[in-house]
Amino acid sequence: MIGNARMSQKYPTSSSRKRSPLSSGKYSAIGLLAYCRPGFEAECAQELQNIASLQFVYGYSKIDKGTGVVFWRCSQGNPLDVYKEIEVSRCIFARQVFCALHDIEIEDTTDRVSPVVEALRPGGAFGFLHIETPLEDEAGSLQKLAKKLTAPMSAALRNAGVLSKAKTDELPQLHLVCLSGQHIIAALAVHPNSSALPLGIPRLRFRNEAPSRSALKIEEAFLTMLTPAEREFVLKRGQRGVDLGAAPGGWTWYMVTQGVKMTAVDHGALQQELLEDPAVTYVSDDGYVYKPQRKVDWVVCDIVDKPKRTMERMADWLCYDWTTYALFNLKLPMKTRMDEVEACLQRLQERLLGADIESEVRVKQLYHDREEVTVLALTGHFLTAFQKH
């Protein structure tokens, strides 16, 4: 936190939450396991290392490019200390993070259960078992293996006292991650350090009346970047908003479904049904030039352009008090993606500080994002309603 601009920390901690299930047993960790968008493994690995460095814990990452999996192996310090300070919803590139306990190589594929039980027997207990794979193969063999292992593995772990007889949130969850038929990583998870969503992915249903699939992107942003209470506070019926670069109207359509009256700004064509909607005002203009006639509650923007240009325009909207909240995407270059994100956030922070605007800024690469990240900027009464320390 710098000055009086309350930007959310790059890697916010979870130390203020209630007593963690991790205090219920003894767990020995070897590192962190994270899932991210395939192709962004290097950025995710850098993010994990940055988080660990804040706790004076160090290690190295094992990356298989294109898999969306990062295994960060600790070489100095306790990775459990790092995991306790992670809140995955505040990570940028990691969509799921576990605390890795054991890296298990299966020598005899006729018995995958015994090596796992033997590795876990000396440690703490778990309240629930998930067997999963983040990897996709054409035959779905790993998914089938995970399903096949669940019943015998659960029974064996219960008999060994590793898994509780009944599901409980009082203990961490055990995740057995199948990276191949002979390679399993045993990891623990507690919420909100880890995502409660399978593989960290929200399962959203595309509605045929939506103008484009980008509607899923903005829906995911509101569902995952805000808590239910926060969402209820900032997104209300009767609000007014502006969608810059709106065509064909996916983001405008979603905001209208939430009861927000929208001004859709674009030289391109809007979906005909939206043009006829009384809650939508269409303005044929450049999204980077348009100025509102009066302050609105929301500005949203998904324009494909250089990230610094988008960020500067969004900073204008916030600093000139044209809007209370902003949700926008930054399209990232093929190289130096982490550097680009950090540079944009630093510049936004400078602009907000210069305008003496207190804010909270959250950044996330969503499942429905591509070569981009989504930024949520919150100002006004939100900051007093949801004090963060």
UniProtKB/Swiss-Prot annotation:
GO annotation terms (biological process): methylation; rRNA processing
Name of the protein this chain belongs to: Ribosomal RNA large subunit methyltransferase M
Compartments where located: Cytoplasm
Keyword entries, A-Z: Cytoplasm, Methyltransferase, rRNA processing, S-adenosyl-L-methionine, Transferase
Disordered: annotated segments: 1-24
Function: Catalyzes the 2'-O-methylation at nucleotide C2498 in 23S rRNA.
Compositional bias ranges of the Polar residues kind: 1-13
Molecular functions per Gene Ontology: S-adenosylmethionine-dependent methyltransferase activity
Active site, renumbered: 331
Enzyme Commission number(s) of this protein: 2.1.1.186
HAMAP family: 23SrRNA_methyltr_M
Reactions catalysed, as given in the entry: cytidine(2498) in 23S rRNA + S-adenosyl-L-methionine = 2'-O-methylcytidine(2498) in 23S rRNA + S-adenosyl-L-homocysteine + H(+)
Residues binding S-adenosyl-L-methionine, per UniProt: 214, 247-250, 266, 286, 302
PANTHER family: RIBOSOMAL RNA LARGE SUBUNIT METHYLTRANSFERASE M (PTHR37524), RIBOSOMAL RNA METHYLTRANSFERASE FTSJ DOMAIN-CONTAINING PROTEIN (PTHR37524:SF2)
